[in-house]
Amino acid sequence: MSERFPNDVDPIETRDWLQAIESVIREEGVERAQYLIDQLLAEARKGGVNVAAGTGISNYINTIPVEEQPEYPGNLELERRIRSAIRWNAIMTVLRASKKDLELGGHMASFQSSATIYDVCFNHFFRARNEQDGGDLVYFQGHISPGVYARAFLEGRLTQEQLDNFRQEVHGNGLSSYPHPKLMPEFWQFPTVSMGLGPIGAIYQAKFLKYLEHRGLKDTSKQTVYAFLGDGEMDEPESKGAITIATREKLDNLVFVINCNLQRLDGPVTGNGKIINELEGIFEGAGWNVIKVMWGSRWDELLRKDTSGKLIQLMNETVDGDYQTFKSKDGAYVREHFFGKYPETAALVADWTDEQIWALNRGGHDPKKIYAAFKKAQETKGKATVILAHTIKGYGMGDAAEGKNIAHQVKKMNMDGVRHIRDRFNVPVSDADIEKLPYITFPEGSEEHTYLHAQRQKLHGYLPSRQPNFTEKLELPSLQDFGALLEEQSKEISTTIAFVRALNVMLKNKSIKDRLVPIIADEARTFGMEGLFRQIGIYSPNGQQYTPQDREQVAYYKEDEKGQILQEGINELGAGCSWLAAATSYSTNNLPMIPFYIYYSMFGFQRIGDLCWAAGDQQARGFLIGGTSGRTTLNGEGLQHEDGHSHIQSLTIPNCISYDPAYAYEVAVIMHDGLERMYGEKQENVYYYITTLNENYHMPAMPEGAEEGIRKGIYKLETIEGSKGKVQLLGSGSILRHVREAAEILAKDYGVGSDVYSVTSFTELARDGQDCERWNMLHPLETPRVPYIAQVMNDAPAVASTDYMKLFAEQVRTYVPADDYRVLGTDGFGRSDSRENLRHHFEVDASYVVVAALGELAKRGEIDKKVVADAIAKFNIDADKVNPRLA
């Protein structure tokens, strides 16, 4: 039942009203009915009735009336002085960096508009990590980082040297431009740029906390996830796209705080409209608790005196472009162009000075109004809350930026502007010192210093603060625990099924089974994982309140409050966010979880690449499984599904470790290696990307001594003898079998011998080669290091064929010890057909490997060129067909 609409206490009266309007419509027409309704609404507005209730848009006033405001628990004057120092230090941080003329950039206006909001939260709401839980998880708006640094400096957590090194990180002891855990691993928890990542990440972080609690893994009941956002940022699809998830999951541990300063980078967010109304309607419709913080305490008297309802009407009518302009002018302008619109509103301020009018504050700059909103959010149960805080961009910055379209880009300021800020916020800096752009500090024992630290101690300590590693020791499975996968498989299976079997091995391991988090974007049946539904259950905070259609089946669709699988529906970005929350739980919760997100490989890095990059920044640890991979392997799905480049995208992320295994035993070794590296003693900040296939074929036993090569990226699979020269053949994934077939043809039909290599990771081999070359360049007097691939291979001509773009295997060209290295790949758009036809079309099958190998030998003069031409004819290769890259 909605709080706004209690049960009808007088149905007879209600019926009378409804019948009356029906009669008017019937007898006098729609226009007359509309007129009467308008008059009723106007009269209701005078009486303070929320005339838009039920439409999702209420009057343009505070949600919490004055009489319901709680008493403010802090010392307002002390907090003002502390806040003024933080404001000042934030601006000094940017100005002092800008003086170095290094073109560093920086943003001042965003924090100035939200400083009071953050200050109230730091003093009264943000709980730090403690012995019971990980504290509140705060997604700070990216552009306000100078303000957070300024507070940490006052707290003694950052030094003046660090502030002076804002955006200067190369030589150490600097501060990152925005929240970046990679760059400040003990400070920032969550990267929130690019914009849009914060809100959707916060939703799934809140969901994951509920998941941990419902599964009995950790008590997260006192934790709140706060996401601080900009109204301009809300245009990002990621910002609003998942808000209904918060309602579905009953995320009352989630609070969005949208700083509605009405401006984005270039100008107004909605100059001709009202962004707060727009957001209110969206969130109200999505089932959130909406709290508007529109006007500060100085408006309370005027609203009490507004017996005509004209002031509220005026507030409702005024568009954002005007509200922005008002705060870039002065009190006289506001008197004329706002209050002067109606005689009733002009009369309200007739005896006010222009200065009094100018001092009318917006809600986002009033600690009392802000505190009331956050306390109400804290008390709300069963639904997420959004706080819409009306603010001014560049608040207090005067002519330099306040309410101006240029505010976001302001990073320099003349001394008149600096003096204005000093005077505006009563900052204790003398005229003699102001040219030095000094920072403000509070001596130990001062009122401000004592209060600042006392408030944080009440809330368990300081934040942001990040825990780089988890403290417990996990008992991980040994490679022998995956023994069944290391042996020859009795039936043909795919590497995807090999992954599922490896997952089942871990689910039987008492030490880590509860830490596994299988994540699916509505494709479990595609990947053969439906057997897990009944085995470990699908997480649902509501349990299962219905009888599933397939209840009589062994693998029925079982939802459970304690379910282990996160089934995110057709929502790759949401599934990715759940994976990221689980993959960073080792830090946020000191509770290492082991997530496996399996998906169509085409819809991974290509679809959610920005999130994958952020995962690297956030130091995620977990497994991404790119199922149905390979341009020609997912054969029937066509152009948009067939992945031939996810490994190109994954290699752009420095701490993403990528593999393209061909055999079940390779999958087992790689997964075991990932467990050891991420969750073993080293606790490496990497995550694994493993592509798996939907093609069934024979899986041999692991050759003796192959383990090291599987981990490092290459090992020799077999040698086939020949009498007329020798080549080296490299393959990965599904195409490795075609490479092996080519080796047989070369030996049988042409007498050419081959060394055949399984390349599990061209990317890791390339990185190893680059590392060796760098070391050798910088250590000219030392014995040169040799790339691993050069240690394994020899100088015979080499041919590589994969189900990915040529660039994938081209990565290692420099490090291959052979002078002749030919790469085959699947450049071009995919299409639907049989695997056989597709592999021939993309020129990666056995016939093309044979022709390429013969061609390399012919270049060396070891065989006649006619042999190559005859092979082309033998395999029915159309030498003049369109290049598949262009086809």
UniProtKB/Swiss-Prot annotation:
Pfam families on file: PDH_E1_M, Transketolase_C_1, Transketolase_N
Modified residues (N6-acetyllysine): K716
InterPro entries attached to this UniProt entry: PDC_E1_N, PDH/Transketolase, PDH_E1, PDH_E1_M, THDP-binding, Transketo_C/PFOR_II, Transketolase-like_C_2, Transketolase_N
Positions bound to Mg(2+): D231, N261, Q263
GO CC list: cytosol; membrane; pyruvate dehydrogenase complex
One Gene Ontology biological process: pyruvate catabolic process
Annotated keywords: Acetylation, Magnesium, Metal-binding, Oxidoreductase, Pyruvate, Thiamine pyrophosphate
GO MF, any single term: protein homodimerization activity
Lineage top rank: taxon: Bacteria
Catalytic activities: N(6)-[(R)-lipoyl]-L-lysyl-[protein] + pyruvate + H(+) = N(6)-[(R)-S(8)-acetyldihydrolipoyl]-L-lysyl-[protein] + CO2
Cofactors (names): Mg(2+); thiamine diphosphate
EC number from the UniProt entry: 1.2.4.1
Protein purpose: Component of the pyruvate dehydrogenase (PDH) complex, that catalyzes the overall conversion of pyruvate to acetyl-CoA and CO(2).
Subunit organization: Homodimer. Part of the PDH complex, consisting of multiple copies of pyruvate dehydrogenase (E1), dihydrolipoamide acetyltransferase (E2) and lipoamide dehydrogenase (E3). In pull-down experiments interacts with CedA.
Name used for this protein in its record: Pyruvate dehydrogenase E1 component
Species classification: Bacteria, Pseudomonadati, Pseudomonadota, Gammaproteobacteria, Enterobacterales
